[in-house]
A protein has these predicted regions:
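N-terminal module-boundary/linker segments of secreted carbohydrate-active enzymes
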Residues: 9-81
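Domain-level detector of nuclease and nuclease-like folds
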Residues: 88-205
Length: 205
């Protein structure tokens, strides 16, 4: 419950002026369990306006811009120029950047509408590294088959990780001690966890 409450607060802080927070939280008061989940989902969808999949390119120029004006890529340290370095095709790391669904879009049917274009969990990333991640769940890697700039893919450690078609409302698949996962760079694990939690709260069902 603490994690859910903390996550709700983090989501609210990103989209809601401080003076409006009491009103924003009003429907969450006194709720727990499924009723709290439903109320959070309603709140996160209220007033939401989709940018569209193509609109993400423009939005990234504001949401994911480094202090030097370059693209902020959480999968690599490559230096990208907005627009000029958009993918396109790629064969190696640092060829171009694309739009990464931190919650893989195949988990909700492959659509680029609805959750498929929600910038809360989409970020610009290296096209090659994104391709290597594929639609594997995030997790801790025990033995890497691929790594670049601290991001890696490989066998999961002995923990249970939820994957599968979660957003569509299914239970998903459980990986415990085996299977392939993708581990983001350490400094961005919190960012991706926040994107996961926010995306799942908003679109599950």
């Amino acid at each position: 419950m603490f994690l859910l409450t903390l996550t709700v607060f983090a989501i609210a802080k990103t989209v809601t002026p401080a003076s409006s927070l009491p009103d924003y939280y009003a429907d969450l008061q006194g709720k727990s369990g499924k009723s709290l989940f439903d109320a959070v989902q309603k709140v996160t969808k209220t007033g939401y306006s989709s940018l569209g999949y193509s609109g993400l390119w423009t939005a990234f120029k504001t949401t994911d811009k480094k202090s030097n004006g370059k693209v902020w890529d959480m999968y690599s340290d490559c230096s990208w120029t907005f627009g000029a370095d958009q993918c396109g095709t790629y064969s190696d790391e640092c060829d171009c950047y694309n739009r990464e669904h931190s919650i893989p879009k195949s988990w909700f049917g492959g659509s680029t509408s609805g959750p498929g274009c929600d910038i809360f969990h989409l970020v610009p990333t290296d096209g090659k590294v994104n391709g290597m991640r594929s639609n594997y769940a995030f997790g801790e890697v025990s033995s890497a088959s691929y790594s670049y700039d601290g991001a890696k893919k490989g066998s999961a450690k002995s923990i249970t990780i939820m994957g599968g078609n979660t957003i569509a409302g299914n239970d998903g698949t459980s990986i415990s001690g085996s299977g392939t996962v993708f581990e983001p760079r350490d400094e961005y694990k919190g960012d991706f966890a926040r994107g996961y939690m926010g995306g799942l709260l908003k679109w599950a069902g």
